[in-house]
Amino acid sequence: MRGSALLDLILFLLVSPLAHSFKGSEISKFYDKSISNQISQSDRESGYVLVSTVDGSISLVDMSSQKLDWTFHTNEPIYSSYQAPHYHYTTDEERSSVLGDDFYMDCDKDWRLYNSSVRKGKRVNEIVDASEFIGTLPYTSTDRIVLGKKDTSVFLLDWKTGKLVKRYRMDELYSNTVVENDKEKAIVLSKEAPLLFGSGFKKSEDFPELVYIERKDFKIQCISKFGDVLWSVSYAKMEAKLQNHESVQFISGLSSSVGKNQFPLSYTTSVPMVQLRNVKYETLFPRLGFLDEALYLPFQDRKPNQLAIGDGNQLTLPGNKEAEEVLSLPLPETVISQITDIIDGSTKQAGFASKFSGLIVLIFGFCVTMLSVCGLFFYRLRQSIRIKEPYVSEVPIATPKKKKSKKNGTTKAVHKKENGFISGGNKDPSHEENEKRLLTAFPGLNNSSAEGYRVGKLFVSNKEIAKGSNGTVVLEGSYEGRLVAVKRLVQSHHDVAQKEILNLMASDKHSNIVRWYGVDQDEHFIYISLELCACSLNDLIYASSALLESPMASSSIHSIQINPIFENGKGVELWKENGHPSPVLLKLMRDIVAGLVHLHDIGIVHRDLKPQNVLIVKNSSLCAKLSDMGISKRLPADTSALTRNSTGLGSGSSGWQAPEQLRNERQTRAVDLFSLGCVLFFCMTGGKHPYGDNYERDVNVLNDQKDLFLIESLPEAVHLLTGLLNPDPNLRPRAQDVMHHPLFWNSDMRLSFLRDASDRVELENREEGSQLLAALESTAAVTLNGRWDEKLDSIFLDNIGRYRRYKFDSIRDLLRVIRNKLNHYRELPKELQELLGSVPEGFERYFSSRFPKLLIQVYTVLFDYCNNEEFFFKYSKTTVF
């Protein structure tokens, strides 16, 4: 450690003088006029000027001393625009329908929004007010949609240093309070903000001067009917205002004299500000580069000590005062010798000698830096080699055994494992050697063996099952003698791990949630021991679909590690010959819904439901289980939606997110229902997606452009998915309702419902104008598609005609026929029984094949009119399939 620290110090001392070797700055003549035209004569003679470049950087220039005082990088550009090229469209019809009259919008050099269109063969630019125009949006037509948005934000900076004190945005606002002298004082700073001042200031001169950078962002986008972005423009207008000392007192502690209707912040002095649309910070100050900020030494963790008191409130104890100090190296004093000339509209060229000397210093600094880094690397490598041989534990554990590989035709070697669980495929010898070196390099892994290493009660194998994002890896392992999947997360993601553990504990012991056994950690990683599963739903569907298309595809199944499910090269039957889901697939789909029902019942929103996060376990039958709840959220008590701060950007996976997730809007349990619709479609179609290919899914989700053509032969699926994929989250069904949807009913349940529906409809009096009966018969055109007698066999019609007469255009009479023949099936002639098939499968298939929409149409009507009646509870409240 001493050698490492010494090398770090040498590296720092060698590099730090480079910061002092750059003096002066040059600004190209090309930008002189655009700056000087925006500055008044009085501002050019004295005072300060703030210069903002297109990348969002803000620099303070002191006119009296001709120095660049500081630069603050917002990392948010103040201007960007895009226009789709005409040649993007392959046909003249597409080009004309999409581009129309070549209308687009942009902002000019004076930061004024204008619309540009062709009128009478000439292009005309018309200045418009951005705020008023956005207020009229959205605009929709047959060939385009124009969307707009206006955001406001404020950056509170220390006037002297340019350091960020606080950023105010609508999606980030929250307050923080402390207690002092039994009085509550408001603190502007958040926990993450630099501690520039706090509640201890008593005099106005103790407060730093603050500058408020007010920013207004305008965003406008035009989208074609094909979902393509035709053009977009985003730009910002910024103003700066300097805060006086008296106003700052209102920030630190509200005075009792301030009335309820008074706004405590009053601006006093405006600071001139210049916005350069086509200039980047590096272009304006080409020789400053990385020297625009001070170099900071590492500081200690200054998180306040907290004690839980009372009903869970936290008492914040005073932290270490020394830890609050942030040490920094002095920022080099950069003299901008030409700043006066810039404002006046003229510049001087730097000499060749100055440029050449600067280049030499850069090359020298780069060489010294690389040599120092290489020296540090080889020193640490040498230290790692000195580590003793790892200790091999003698405790008997279920260590995965190596199996000889076997080949199937042209297939590469495939590893099989006991108990039908997955294992890694072939590994390159060099890769295995690298793994051993990795274990040796980490001091925390000293107690490792050739097969893996032990952490507490957990033995972690070197066999990798899967990889996740942000360094997360899933490995095989053993926890107290039980085979488990070990989810290894880096320590920096401790919050994600803790959240997943808490949610797993809350949802544990449900048959459709992955079991959690324990958690361990070492210096580098957190290890979560989970139930070991055979594969993911994603792998199962793709492999089964490949086998369905070509039986020879079994030779490549090992690539997705699901060999145990496919015995003798044969996969499980997930689809019937007609393409409809098999009972096995329907059970897996029900398992997913059941797991989601359980999570929602205990107040957990998964937020990342997708085929990769549904795992398959093979026991006596296949079972689906929900997993990977690292970004799931617990709903607060007595609430149905997540708070604004807890929704979070980036929740979920691209292509599987609800539109409100993509827009970062209010999120409820309904976000999981939308993802569920996509997952169910994925299952029924053998790996397809209702919103198209990967690159276009999110755009299609936002535009509600789904395609359910592949499941049109299954009306129950169309009905369910149309509800689940509704863009309005309030109109999506609950998970509990999905659980009882007719899509998941077996043949016995379907026939039982049609029989009970007929009994219920018979109670209605046709002559009294029954609303239920009228609603049912109104669906005849869709349900029957003509007369129902035209779709039945003559032998069947002869049999029913012997007893009574029927109306062949009435759904009520068709239900009566089905009910009567089902009740008297044993009394039917043998040839008619053979025609109808056995009860329930054959009998139900006879009618559903001729009237595929009968069940869902009758269900929809009775759900609306009889949902609260006792006979209907069997189909909407109980889980009978």
Curated annotation (Swiss-Prot):
EC number, UniProt record: 2.7.11.1, 3.1.26.-
Transmembrane segments: 358-378
Function noted in UniProt: Senses unfolded proteins in the lumen of the endoplasmic reticulum via its N-terminal domain which leads to enzyme auto-activation. The active endoribonuclease domain splices bZIP60 mRNA to generate a new C-terminus, converting it into a potent unfolded-protein response transcriptional activator which then induces transcription of UPR target genes. Involved in organ growth regulation. Plays a role in plant immunity and abiotic stress responses. Required for ER stress-induced autophagy.
GO terms of biological process kind: autophagy; defense response to bacterium; endoplasmic reticulum unfolded protein response; immune system process; mRNA processing; positive regulation of autophagy in response to ER overload; response to salicylic acid; RNA splicing
Positions glycosylated per UniProt: N115
Loss of function: phenotype: No visible phenotype. Ire1a and ire1b double mutant is more sensitive to the ER stress inducer tunicamycin than the wild-type and is enable to give rise to the spliced bZIP60 mRNA form. Ire1a and ire1b double mutant displays short roots and a ER stress-sensitive phenotype.
Protein name, as recorded: Serine/threonine-protein kinase/endoribonuclease IRE1b
Gene name tied to this protein: IRE1B
First-listed, main subcellular location of the protein, grouped into a coarse class: endoplasmic reticulum
GO cellular component: endoplasmic reticulum; endoplasmic reticulum membrane
Signal peptide boundaries: 1-21
UniProt binding sites for ATP: I465, A466, K467, G468, S469, N470, G471, T472, V473, K487
